From Swiss-Prot:
Name of the featured protein: Small ribosomal subunit protein uS8
Molecular function via GO: rRNA binding; structural constituent of ribosome
Gene Ontology CC terms, in alphabetical order: ribonucleoprotein complex; ribosome
UniProt family annotation: Belongs to the universal ribosomal protein uS8 family.
Keyword NADP: no
Function text: One of the primary rRNA binding proteins, it binds directly to 16S rRNA central domain where it helps coordinate assembly of the platform of the 30S subunit.
Gene3D superfamilies attached to this UniProt entry: 3.30.1370.30, 3.30.1490.10
Keywords, sorted A to Z: Ribonucleoprotein, Ribosomal protein, RNA-binding, rRNA-binding
Lineage per the UniProt record: Bacteria, Pseudomonadati, Pseudomonadota, Alphaproteobacteria, Sphingomonadales
Gene: rpsH
Length: 131
């Protein structure tokens, strides 16, 4: 069965894995998911990820991160959804928790955090917010 929102599925797997105190979670692989995981790893919200083969499908094993027993991610939410896309210019990109969190943005220059998008002066689709 095809997923209507693969990115939403990835975020839910990460959120559920952290609530269950898992060390890692597995998700089907896609280019968008890999790029979002790159941003999360670069910003320090996950330890990293590895690409693996499960049967005849590509998968991603995501290593979750904890700090003093608490999940590194307190809030992980999809902003732009398949039924309602949200776009923002570089100057209007939302700040999460007054800059303590990040917004993940899909831009013409790739998937970036809000700070990287502002530095490169590009806007795009606001995919998710994390803190």
């Amino acid at each position: 069965m095809a997923l209507s929102d693969p990115l939403g599925d990835l975020l839910t797997r990460i959120r559920n894995g952290q609530h269950a105190r898992k060390d890692s979670v597995v998700s089907p692989a896609s280019k968008l998911r890999v790029r979002v995981l790159d941003v999360l790893a670069r910003e320090g919200y996950i330890r990293g990820y590895t690409e693996a083969k499960l049967g005849n499908h590509d998968a991603l094993r995501i290593e979750l991160k904890y700090f003093e027993g608490q999940p590194a991610i307190h809030h992980l939410a999809r902003v732009s959804k398949p039924g309602r896309r949200i776009y923002s210019g570089s100057r209007e990109l939302p700040r999460v928790r007054n800059g303590l969190g990040i917004t993940i943005v899909s831009t013409p220059k790739g998937v970036l955090s809000d700070a990287e998008a502002r530095d490169q002066n590009v806007g795009g689709e606001v995919l998710a917010e994390v803190f």
